[in-house]
Amino acid sequence: MPQPPVPRESRVRAGIVPPYLLLRIAAAEEHYDVAADAARRSLLRDEPMRELRVEGAHPGLLPHEHTRSATTGRDHDVEAEGEGAPVDAAVPEPAPDRRISDAQGAESLPGHLVRTEGQPATGDVAVDQAYDGLGEVWALFERVYGRDAIDGEGAPLEATVHFGDHYDNAFWDGERMVFGDGDGEVFRGFTQSISVIGHELAHGVTEMTARLRYRDQSGALNEHVSDVFGALTEQYAMGQDAEAATWLIGEGIFTELVQGRALRSMLEPGTAYDDDVLGRDPQPAHFRDYIVTDADNGGVHLNSGIPNRAFALAAVELGGFAWEHVGRIWYDALTGGTLRPNDGFAVFAAATLAAARERYGDVSREVAAVANGWRAVGVEPE
């Protein structure tokens, strides 16, 4: 069964845009009148974030049998059945339950419900992008990993769009995904990126499973897991293999005024943007460059680049579709019940290696690729 809900006062507002980037924008008022003001107000809204301090982990789901959908052609998982087990045709197929609300520029949640599952497109771009994006995230988790929604039991997928006045972020608040429209100078609307939508929903999955504390190394892992499943959602939706994938998080949310491709690059941390005003992407790509700081909840958005690169390197080494191999390993590690809220990189690396051995065998390409990925970024599994 899923973990009991986290009390609202203990929930983390896990935003996709790091505070260090908002601070740079806030200080750039001579270049961006609207964006600087929007960034300052966004920082004030995000300041009351609380740390997640919940102990324990959900044991997760059992391994699933690998099958291919006859209707979509995509890979997905079904519960392994005993030989000759009868199939109950009356059991309905899992389906998403999407509920999109509109905050109409206010900061109160959830806003006005404007589109529910099965309803036609509204014509509001943000509403319809959120609806479609949630469908893609649900498809990845259900068809590949056998997880029906965030809690694994078909809970509604709730999202609110048009949050705040020029709000420069998107976040998971413990119940729903919330998307701002951006300021129009630096950021476009945050529903434009499937990787952002997948990133935010994955925070909910982490909250229901390993509950990685949102600070220091465990917080960087929390952000890393969301980046992983954000990237995999985009790759799955677009049918991209590991070589064709961009490995970018938030591609398309910068306007043409910014010299940058995205918020983060998983394959090449530190290269996502290099802008005369906003500066250069500060993410480290190796553990020797780990940033010790009190800001950004102990550098959760900064240091997530280290495990991000380990994952991407393992996926590229294996080739093919990343969600089929390294994605399965990371999902097994996240939901396997061995992680604790304060675990760091070395413990998580060991969990992924154990998951790879369990699924693919001690002597396998998958185990070697995962080990090589962690070795390349200087993390020694504990």
Question: Which ranges hold each PLM region?
Answer:
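Zymogen propeptides/activation segments of proteases
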Residues: 1-195, 207-382
